[in-house]
Amino acid sequence: MNRELIVNVTPTEISIAMCEDKVLVELNKEQCQTGFAVGDIYLGKVRKIMPGLNAAFVNIGHEKDAFIHYLDLGPQFPSLQKLVASQQPGKRGFRVESMKLEPPVEKTGKIGEYLQVGQQIMVQVAKEAISTKGPRLTADISLAGRNVVLVPFTSKVFLSQKIRSADEKKRLKRIAAAVLPKNFGVIIRTAAMEAKDEDIEHDIQTQIDRWRKTCAAIKKNAASAPAQLMSEMNRANTIIRDSLNGSFSQIAVDDEAMYNDIRGYIRQIEPEKEKIVKLYRGNVPIFDNFDISKQIKSLFAKYVSLRRG
């Protein structure tokens, strides 16, 4: 199967089309400069507790307050808050690996037991703002790489269900155990099956470094919260991270800044594939050139063709 990623950039929107053997199979659109993306991490301030909803509204700097439900605090919220408190001005601060973890959140508790108005909390955007609604948040923080997802405040190693080989499971668990500090766990993704030991080790260490930079940003921004602590990569790079494999033959981009961004990202995760990133300079719009526009239009026609009839 031959895969291509076609990226169209306009001043207001980024459109990303994934094609398999020239057939459009996935289309993603992302608004430019919205300021909030899924995966972004913030130091927010609790604005209002809603006991009836068992939820709270949190100010993260958006025009609309963000929403967090009790179940989205995550089991390790007390440990997370202990870390946030240690990073406040005048406090010495400490690392996750040196912490004694707090008892987990009860599954049937009340949000008022853990949050109060004015409290600073570390949160991650789980769902972007839609219409009049602000972003949806989680305090169950995780950092995704190509091969792994880092999960602080646990020592568990989880494997993708698609990894079935006993030998491969043993290899991946061995790699994780050798690299992970105390109180850090990982979810090992399907992509790790094709990865070398050193690539997985590097991915884990990269996510640990990102986490440490995020924690350092708490101390820097505690006096001026709400503040962004860590920004997730753009949507194009996220798709590449999650789906890049040997079947990709081309990534075509019609914007030079985005081209350089994607090329730089691939150089980090899979240098030998950097050459498949192409800057499109044609006079015809990129989606027209690759027959994307026509396929999108046909999806909204009265009759839609399906594979195998």
Regions from the PLM with identified roles:
Residues 1-309:
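DE-rich acidic low-complexity regions and acidic surface loops
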